[in-house]
Regions:
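A glycine-rich, coil/turn loop motif that links secondary-structure elements
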Residues: 5, 27-28, 211-215
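Short, solvent-exposed loop/turn elements at domain surfaces
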Residues: 39-44, 58-61, 179-183, 239, ...
Length: 294
């Protein structure tokens, strides 16, 4: 019997398919998630979930890791489409402390494992790393998890060294509520954790609530006159235009001195991928400004 050897094109196609990230169920489990930090983590490990929520918005807000089109969009995070979730036939559902109220319905579909990264007064980085290790162990990707965590620490260390000329000036990471108010990310936010790893001080020392405190008036920025302002999207429509013509805004010391950094979108409730994205975007913005502003 004559056996036909594969052509070069067929061989390349086979190799290309083999190089694609494996779905999570390739190691025995079809996994779904209702939480973005878990989604980031699964994608970073190359373990594709069968379903996850708000994928269009995830691609705009979290941006990375990229979500393949094969992942089913479950709709809103707080009120996922349970019919679509059921049709996705998950064997395991990952959730978080944000979605405890949904668990009675989720457990009717598949077993639920819950993570808690964000809690008042508790820095989230180590819980995020622990979550990555737990997911990696569950899905047979412990090596990938350890490699990713090591790469993150190495990236922070490298950026910290590059940012040494900026280390004497603090950073205040904020998100605009409107043209008169902002939310600030404190020490118990992921952004606050990253600042420490980059050797940068958080200019905001008051208490916050694990992501960002309730909106405060822009006049509070005058309390941190020496800081860099790291502006994190989303920005309300028209807010920047209003601020550009605001005498008060332009009199804020940091703004007047040109120390306003407008960053690209980042998930404020993210896991390690969001932490790395924030570190990279902030470092790029600071380095682009140069030490003259430092």
């Amino acid at each position: 019997m004559n056996l036909r050897l594969p052509t070069r094109r067929e061989t390349l196609a086979i190799l290309a398919v083999a190089a694609l990230p494996r779905p999570a169920h390739a190691v025995g489990l079809r996994v779904a998630t209702v939480d973005w930090s878990v989604l980031e983590t699964l994608l970073a490990l190359g373990a594709l979930p069968v379903a996850a929520p708000e994928l269009l918005q995830f691609r705009e807000v979290a941006v990375e890791p990229a979500v393949p089109p094969s992942v089913t969009d479950l709709g809103l995070r707080g009120t996922v489409n349970f019919e679509l979730l059921l049709l996705s036939r998950p064997e395991l559902i990952y959730s978080s402390s944000f979605y405890v109220s949904s668990e009675p319905r989720l457990t009717r579909i598949a077993p639920v494992e819950r993570f808690s990264i964000y809690a008042p007064g508790r820095p989230p980085y180590e819980p995020a790393a622990a979550m990555m290790r737990s997911i990696g162990a569950r899905l047979g990707r412990s090596d990938e998890a350890e490699r990713y965590i090591a790469e993150a620490e190495a990236e922070f260390a490298a950026l910290r060294e590059r940012l040494t000329p900026h280390a004497q000036r603090p950073v205040i990471p904020i998100n605009l509520g409107d043209a008169r108010h902002f939310r600030v990310f404190g020490a118990d936010s992921m952004f606050g954790e990253v600042l420490k790893r980059l050797g940068l001080a958080n200019a905001w020392s008051d208490d916050t609530s694990y992501s960002a405190m309730a909106p405060v008036g822009l006049e509070a920025l005058a309390r941190v006159p020496d800081a860099w302002i790291a502006l994190i999207p989303p920005v309300p429509p028209g807010a920047l235009e209003v601020l550009a013509g605001s005498t008060f805004w332009n009199a804020v010391p940091s703004v007047r001195a040109g120390r306003l950094l407008q960053l690209a979108s980042i998930n404020p409730y993210g896991g390690l991928p969001a932490a790395r994205r924030f570190a990279r975007l902030l470092a790029e913005a600071l380095l682009a400004k140069g030490p003259a502003h430092g």
